[in-house]
Amino acid sequence: MNVTRTGIVLRPNNTRVLYRPFAPPSPQRATRIVGRVMQLPEEEVERLLHGVMSEFPGRHQRLTGFFGERFESVAHLLLTDGPVSPSRRLLIGSYFTQEYALESAALFNPSLVWHPDQTGLPGGTARFILSLRATGEGHVSSVGFRTGTVDAEGGIVLAPPTGFVTAPRVVANATYEKGLFLRKLVELGLVDGLVDPALEALGDSFTLSQLESALETTGRHHPGGRSEWGPLAAAIVALAKANYEIECDPDSDLSERVLFPFSPTESNGIEDARFVRFVEDDGSVHYRATYTAFDGDVTLPQLVETDDFVRFRLSTLNGPEIADKGMALFPRRIRGRYAMLSRQDGENIHLMESSMLHFWHARRLTLRPSSPWEYVQIGNCGSPIETDAGWLLLTHGVGPMRTYSIGAVLLDIDDPGRVIGRLREPLLSPTENERRGYVPNVVYSCGAGVHAGRLVIPYSMSDHATSFATVPLDDVLAALRADGS
């Protein structure tokens, strides 16, 4: 099969840094830091602040605004209510801020979707958005973005990123739908008669602060006291914090936007986003991605949704079949139901269907390892792609020496649990140049696309960098039909 490696390589760049909160290990240490800065003469404050601002020129946008926010977050530690000069406020804020090189270690596991803006392009050219897993200090992962174009001949051009990266702001007082939130509580076993008064005090939609207030009020009258009510209330608030909204600067370049861990469930990383352009039955278009939330001990599949790549809603997935990692949504409903591929057992690919996007209760086995290059395990490489021949699904297989390769299968268009074609050999296996990296002998993708009769595959090389390959779609489909299931 005529697979063309483009030679394009996206490598991690340790000069791309964002600012983020720095929190000392204890409130006592934070108090001492604030106290030390408060003792400085005003002239020394001015000198130190000038030094900070001079040391980081051109590295960040709106840094002084963030210093101000950081001061407000520790202002309660001040020992008096006396006035604090603007410069001293900013200097205190700088002591509670740090830089983070979000892609200093790796830039990998890409997924590709077609950009909502296709204007201003030559004929036969399409613009895409590439999501990437960026890994930095402490092996914390986030999701970054790039844009690019592919022409009718398969030529790919990536837009260079700007020199800035800015974490989004969490939307204040984002609303929760009471019905959906209640169902998630039920799934987690967090609802009993003792919680009812708090929920009844909430309207059909509510904010986090309203939820916390209702829980606080109910807790004061809880018969079991704080020892019983405290952990239950904390678990309910944790669920709310795992379902949140963020907003990026709409005037920023897409390469400046990042999905950085915020909730407790993802404190150690947002991993392997599999974006898909999802078309609802009414024709409306949404961009959705499953991702893996990691808190240092537990991995959980979660969902991110956006219409414009400016405002994002991140939410939990629920149900007995939500487990492990590597889930991928189909790009539309099938027979009126959402469909998603999964790998709960860590070895085989399953198909799930549900009438509700956030709840998954059943699965059926669809694909087992069958060829030597995938005897260890198989999984998906992103959402299935709809073709006239069926659903084209890229897979990854793990073989000898834990080598990861990319393969393909064809699923029935009306019954995607039925396999109608399967490659016996991989589409892509790591070459000598690709096998060297953080995790050797790996090629991997989180989502490809089809343009002008070509399958465009972004793929990572050994968990370190990212490249692209293209292959005629007809060649892939012909091989799938020839190899059968």
Stretches found by the model and what they are:
Residues 328-332, 381-383, 445-450:
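Beta-rich, blade/repeat-based domains predominating
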Residues 1-268, 277-327, 332-376, 386-438, ...:
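Beta-rich carbohydrate-recognition and catalytic domains
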Residues 434-448:
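A conserved acidic, glycine/proline-rich C-terminal tail/linker
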